[in-house]
Amino acid sequence: MSTQSIFDGDNVVVYSASDPLLLFIVQAIIIIALCRLIHIPLSFLQQPRVIAEIIGGIVLGPTVMGRIPKFLDYIFPTSSMGPLNLVSNLGLVLFLFVIGMEVDLRVLVLNYKVTLLVTVFSIVIPFGAGAGISAGLYKFTTREFEFGKFLLFISTAMSITAFPVLARILSELHLLHKRVGVIVLSAGIGNDVIGWILLALSVTLVNSGSGVRAVYILLLALGWCLFLFIAIKPLVYLLAVKTRSLKDKPSESFICIVLSMVLVSAFFTDIIGIHPIFGGFLVGTIIPHENDLTVKITEKIEDLVNCLFLPLYFASSGLKTNISTLNTGKIWGYTIGTICVAIASKMGSSMLAARILKMPWSDSLVVGSLMSCKGLVELIVLNIGLSTGILNETIFSMFVFMAVITTFVTTPMTKFFLRFTKSEHDDNSIESSEELVQYLPELPTRLSFLINHPLDASAAMIFIQHIYENRDKVSGCLHLPQIIIHSIWTLFVDSRTSNLLRASQVDNKVENEALMGLFETFVKIKKFEYESNALLVSGTGYYNVVLETLKKSSSNILIMPYLKDYKTIENESSSSPLSLSSIRLALGDSFKSLDELIPLIKMARIPVGVFFTRNPHNLSVKKIRPIIRSTEYGSPKNDFEQLEKDKKSFDQVEISVKEKGSTYERSKVVILIYLGTENDLIALELLLKFLYEETSIAYIYTYDEFYKDDYATSLPNVVYTSEVLLSKHNDSAFKVWPKLRKNIRKITKPNGFTTDQHSQTFIPSQTHTKLDLRLSDVTDSVRSRINVVKFGNLNSLLSCLHELIQPATLTPSFETEKSITMFLGCRDKQAVSEKLEVAALSEMKKLGYIESSSEFGMLAGLIPLVLLSNFPLIDFFLGKAPTKMVQGY
């Protein structure tokens, strides 16, 4: 308990050797808060936190705040550095233990050729460059040590690469899954191991005083390494098995024994004359990597190390840094020269190794810029050099400045050179709507599913099941295109070391991941070909990675499946069905996650589809009304008598009815809301693939401006089959595609109207011509099961859909074999669909609709959001045309 108290008028921050805790707490709060504040602006530049911690230490030191009178005397007095250094060095030992666990020797073995080549080049050449510049830097020392020892230390500092910082930069730039990232990661591990060996050798030679003593120290260090790897490593594995730490979470006893080993190893390496951090590093390398054991251990200690211990260490380092000692032109000349030599030697050597590996110049430059990263490990080396007396304050400050600059420029340099790498999806685009019409019939032959969450996999399996049912029940004489299922699994990683460890073991993880294996088994049981990719991505900005993966797989369409939450939908009645809150409830977590993926949807150069589903069980379907007409009072009725009278003109609709008054229930009902946009064509193509099954039926609701002022009519008063739309009386289709005339037969119009009298009623607008063309390509069997319904406003559309889909029956049903899937296109501000939205928006607001300000709401548009909220329990497919599509008709 503290003997100082504010009630006694004591200065509680005065250092007391018997009770140093109060001042230590004040120091820790100031250091951590300042480092976090500095990191906020640097994070927007994608800079690692270590730069903020180094700068924070420099700011607290004599360079900046040390110039405030009495600041260092009261807050960081020399006498208080003992406890601060003790805690920070303990944290450093634990941090090196974590770094040791990052070193997966299996990666070195699998990529030994690449690792050996890049590691040797990236160490030998910078080592030689450091030896050259050390001749000039030696003049700034007191020359208490031999030049050879000084040369060895400077060369080690020049040749080392900060592997922990490097791994985080690779994660931020989404390079971990690429060949460039694999090469740099492997070389970084090799560089890290050799760098620590060189550092141990340097410290040994400095502390030995004689060559014979140095040999003894090295032999003891080698013996300790062999003892750990030969005797202790198998025992650690057996202990992990015995305590069930491999199968489950690491037990408390296992963690206690491992941390005790870290301290013992650090103690031994310190007393033999190397450094305690080397002992912690060695213990980290012997921890088994099976079943993510290193990840689980790291998760237990990394937050304490990264949030408390490391900032204290770098702050104590910054307190020793005095940039004001760089006060002459000659010193600044050597400082700039040191920075240039450090970057040029590291970058040039790594680039040369990459060129030997036959990598392109652009990728070679990326490898070189990444390997020039210094940062955290450099600071450790410099502090050891300062504590041993090899470096004085001037050279120490010079190299700290060099470490900050080289680490700071790593990310911008890498991003700059990445611009010159060939974009693998630049050519993956469709340039015009005419090209899309030709492209669509073959579109869904290779379906790519983006799976970010386990629930997404369930939704993808439901979509695949829909396709399988159609293929499985189709007539044997009908030729179907081969369908390949391609899944893209994303593994999100952040700056946490445990996540980076998990990412580095992704290949092993993919092979053993139960969900991925289950998904693959499901696809193969359905007799589809299967391909998959696992991507290591950070939380944001990974869209280019996905797009490049799509290009490599030659995908025709990207489908993003989402599983909606039934529990939230049950509570929907508490709010307006058109309110934004109801829409959020209908989509569940998909609403938020879709907002994060909007840039991917907008940037895609191939069609994109968003599939919403609730659960694998199908829904009840009300008895289908093949003809829905409107009476003069606006109420709907089934006009089977009129159907019989007009049987001659509506013989294609007759297939939907077995006999007068009967109901013929289809096993699958698919609905398309067609507003004449390119996005709707994407939805149309997927709808047609759902019609291979002979017992399925489709309703295509088309918007026609002719009815936009007909608000008195609650239901559409015109229903046509596709054959009517493709009749020769459709002047626009006849003029644009004369060949269609051969496949079209004359149809007499209903209700006694002559052709001339009724032609203005059923001629679709220009936006429907692509629909006509696509429907003319399908088989007679499919076309006969398509009914086209016109509507003039959103109210009439909703009324018709409510008649088709009975709201009271929208509950989970395990007995029916029926399902409903609705297909829509995203909003298109340049299309006629925008007019429908504008006309309906004011009316929707009166009914309680709150215009969505979300990214997804703006992209999807009013119509899909309203339909999603009105029919939350049916499946939805929302289509989006490629980015470079030329809009217009």
UniProtKB/Swiss-Prot annotation:
Pfam families: Na_H_Exchanger. This is K(+)/H(+) antiporter 1. The keyword Transmembrane applies. It comes from the Eukaryota. Potassium-proton antiport. It is a multi-pass membrane protein. The chain crosses the membrane at residues 12-32, 40-60, 81-101, 116-136, 147-167, 180-200, 215-235, 254-274, 277-297, 323-343, 365-385, 389-409, 858-878. The keyword Ribonucleoprotein does not apply. Keywords: Antiport, Ion transport, Membrane, Potassium, Potassium transport, Transmembrane, Transmembrane helix, Transport. One of its GO terms (molecular function) is potassium:proton antiporter activity. One of its GO terms (biological process) is intracellular potassium ion homeostasis. The gene is kha1. GO terms for cellular component: plasma membrane. It is found in: Membrane. Residues 33-39, 102-115, 168-179, 236-253, 298-322, 386-388, 879-889 are cytoplasmic. Residues 1-11, 61-80, 137-146, 201-214, 275-276, 344-364, 410-857 are extracellular. InterPro entries: Cation/H_exchanger_TM, CPA2_transporter, Na+/solute_symporter_sf. Belongs to the monovalent cation:proton antiporter 2 (CPA2) transporter (TC 2.A.37) family.
